[in-house]
Structure formats: C-alpha cells, structure tokens
Amino acid sequence: FDDEYEYRDYWVLLNDEDLMRFSKWLVKTTIDNYQSYRMLIEKYLKKGWTIDRISKMEQAILLIAVCEILESDLDEKIVINEAVINAKEFCDEDSYKFINGVLHKIV
C-alpha cells in the first residue's frame, strides 16, 4: 500500500458486508457459468484464436466482467472501465486495449 489511508480503506472494504456478499455471488456465478462465458468470449476473439491463447489473468478479468454485464444490474460502461483498470494493473502493457475491445463487442 502506498500510504496509511489506502491501507485503512482496504480494511474498511474487507469488512463491508454488502461488498463481501456481492464478491461471493460474483465468484460463484462466474464459476457456475464458466463454460458459457468462455464460449461467448471466444466468439469475439480474432479468427482462429481460442480463449486458451490469452493469459490466465486476461481470462479472469474477461470472465468476471462478462458475469457482471450479463447477470447484474451494474452499468456496462462501469464494468468495462473496471476491467480496463484491472488489465492496466495486472496484465501486459497493451492488454487493456484487447480487454476493452472484446467487452465492447460483447455489449
């Protein structure tokens, strides 16, 4: 953590019951629909590509975003923005462009 405030904010979020409930729902729903989400994502990849060709982190970000888009009432623009932020933080340099493109095709 960069500073003391960021550390405190993290613990506040961890103790937020609504956030924990949503997080558990998100993980369970993503797992329950794993195969159908993979097929949907694959449909929008470059011709000849499979989802196994992209990194595990990119897969995870896409799967969770697809779950949020299809199964929740969250605004699609917000979901895509969060996915792009996560890709910038946890993936290769240009992965966020790829994630953004795939999710925009899905919505």
Say what each PLM segment does.
Residues 1-96, 100-107:
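N-terminal interaction/assembly modules
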